[in-house]
């Protein structure tokens, strides 16, 4: 029996997925993501609001973002994650696709 050849995926493979399909990429392995439930979205919304309000109250310069919002770690083409909530404190790292 032949085993399928292991493929190392890149960020471009994520971009080539059909519209609305979500996945994350860890060390070249693609992990498909199920659509979030309503309860999940409510919890994420509450977490986002608490973080946003705290930053505003403290006069911080950081900004919170909710998924889908890509975070590129170490400029590695084999890592692409979409955390439920991200806090970005360096606006120079933001681009049209997320945070690099």
Predicted features, each with a name:
Residues 1-100:
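Gly/Pro/Ser/Thr-rich low-complexity, intrinsically disordered segments predominantly at protein N-termini
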């Amino acid at each position: 029996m032949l085993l399928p050849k292991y493929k190392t995926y890149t960020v471009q493979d994520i971009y080539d997925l059909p519209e609305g399909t979500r996945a994350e990429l860890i060390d070249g392995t693609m992990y498909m993501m199920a659509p979030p439930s309503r309860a999940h979205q409510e919890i994420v919304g509450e977490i986002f609001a608490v973080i946003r309000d705290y930053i505003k109250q403290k006069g911080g310069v950081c900004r919170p973002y909710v998924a889908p919002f890509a975070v590129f770690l170490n400029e590695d083409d084999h890592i692409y994650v979409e955390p439920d909530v991200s806090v970005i404190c360096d606006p120079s790292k933001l681009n049209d696709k997320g945070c690099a």
